Structure formats: structure tokens, C-alpha cells
Amino acid sequence: MQNCLGIYIENNLIKYAKVSKDRDTFKVDAFGIRFFDNLNEAIKKIVEETYSFNTPISINLANERYLYYDIFALLSKNDIQKTVETEFETFCDENKYNQKAFETRYALVSNVQNKERIKAIQVIVNKIELNKQKQYLEKHNLSGILPIGTAIASITRFEKKENVLIVNMEEKTTITTIYDRQIYNVETIDHGSQEVLEKINRTENSMSKAYEICKGTTIYTANVIDDAKEQPHLEDIIPTLYQISQKIKEIVDESPVKISTVYLTGTLSVINNVDLYFQEFLPSADCKILKPSIVELNVTQINIKDYIEVNSAISLAMQSLGEGMQSLN
């Protein structure tokens, strides 16, 4: 049996999930969230509490960027690699970046608009940021540092020919476009849970309380009477959700293929009726909370909402165990 501890790290919040794999069956053995002042101590306690002293640990990249290159499909593998390198050099020259300051990986996907071309998705991250993250885990068994924009797709299995968006509303929001089981695009926007939690924290003076307020908040849609007295922090939440909804709408409207489903996950997905809120802006797609297939395949007494809170951590563990995109070069 294989296992992995997925740890999703934000500015002052950790989400973790220990996942085991037996053949094609996955199981969540332990999970949770934790606010922290000292990241090293928080990781140490999570490792101790989950008995993960020798368990491989997978964490998320910090402040990564996604670049896209259009490449002729008939090129050899070596020529494709050279083309990606040349495109990245051009990007660095145009932006006056030091090329050697970045660690890079790329994956190749089909170009749905032109069958004679392929699309290279390149993930880049500053080496200083990357080394900082490695230092946090230097006393533990670090197995991988993964971009959450691609890892989140490993949380469930999509139908063939299904075209979807995964909107991961964490500290920042990543919107992952998937066409026919292939990741096609990842966009990151600054509007996300950090924006909301910081607003609530200004009056509540507690980030953990702000998080619980989000979990207890219900968004009233056009068909339900709004009782603002019972929802004092809606004014802190709705503006961020609106900005996210407009970005999703833009992506759906400009997509070269019809998006059938928009899956919602991340911290802001625990707000009650958030799927109904987004549905009002996206009548052509079905808006759903993203449930990990790992839960649907296993009988459990745990509330599905508790699992959804840590989807990002589950996805990091699952990708390290062989699910999702495995072809980053």
C-alpha cells in the first residue's frame, strides 16, 4: 500500500490530507486545517499527529506562473523542447527577467482550435521561492512540490469529451480549464479567500473565527428573502465572489468549446449556496461543488463538506500517488 501526505500551504493557513492507495482504491486516513504563526512548527505537529514520519509529503508551489506556447505538432521531441526553451528566453528578454532565476516544467496538450498545432503549458517559479519551500520540509520526506492549478484536476475523474472548469477559491483563485480529460489552461486571479478572510478579520480579530463565519454564512439567491441581520458579513464576501464570477463568465464565453460544468472548490466553496450564486451568472453551465472521487468510491460517515475543505491537500497527495497530470517535463 502506498501513501502520501498532501500539505497545501497559504500565508497563515495549512490544509492537510493523508491519502493511502491500494491498487486503484484511494482512502483519506487523516485530514484537517490549521492556522499558524510558525510554519515549521505547524508542519512538525501535522506530521506527528498523522504519524507521517517516513511518509512521502507533497506540497504546493508558491507564486507560480503559467505560460502558453503554440507549437507545430509534427516537430520531434527534441525540437519541441528547443522551441519551448526559445519561447521562454523570449519571454524573459521581453520582461527583463533573469532566465536562470526560474525553475521551469512544461506539458504538451492538444490544440482544440488547430489540429496541426499543439499547446505547451509551462509552469515557472522563482528558485528563491522554491528553495524556501524546500527548507520548510528539509527534516521530512519531501516527495514533490506541485502547481495546484494542475494538481487539483487529480481530485476526480471526468467523463470522456467532458469540458469543465475547476474554480479553486483558495488564498488566490485558480481556474483550471479541462477539455476531454486534458488540462488546457490555468488562470490565477488575486480575488480569493485571503481577501474575504482579511475583511472579516478586521472586525472579528481572529482568522480562525473568520473562517468559521464563512462556513456558517448562507448566500441568499434571487428566489430567497435576504435577511441581512443574520448574515452580517455578506458585504465582505459578495464583492469577491462577484469578481470571481465575472472572470469565470469571461472564460466560459470565450471558450472554443462549450463548457458543460463549472466545479467549485477551495475555502470559499464552503459558503452555503455558493453554487447557486454562481449559477445565476452562468446559465449555460451546471455549477457544482467539486466532490473528490476518493470519497464517492469509499463508504464514509464523515460529512462530505469536511472533505471538500481540504480538496487542495487531497489533490496534491493523489497526484503524487499517480492520479492526474504526470507528464510535466
Where are these regions (language model features)?
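Short glycine-rich phosphate-binding loop at a beta-alpha junction
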Residues: S52-R65, S143-G144, P256-L268
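Adenine-nucleotide phosphate-binding core of ATP-dependent small-molecule kinases
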Residues: R202-T203, E212-T261, L268
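Glycine-rich phosphate-binding/hydrolytic loop that grips phosphoryl groups
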Residues: A151, K288-N329
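N-terminal phosphate-binding loop and adjacent alpha-helix
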Residues: T25-Y51, K77-I80
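Active-site neighborhood for divalent-cation/phosphate handling
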Residues: E64-E159, I294
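Glycine-rich phosphate-binding loops at beta-strand->alpha-helix junctions
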Residues: I259-C287
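Glycine-rich phosphate-binding loop plus the immediately following alpha-helix
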Residues: L130-I152, D180-D226
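Gly/Thr-rich phosphate-binding beta-strand-loop-beta motif of the actin/hexokinase/Hsp70
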Residues: M1-F31, S58-A62, R157-E195, K199-R202, ...
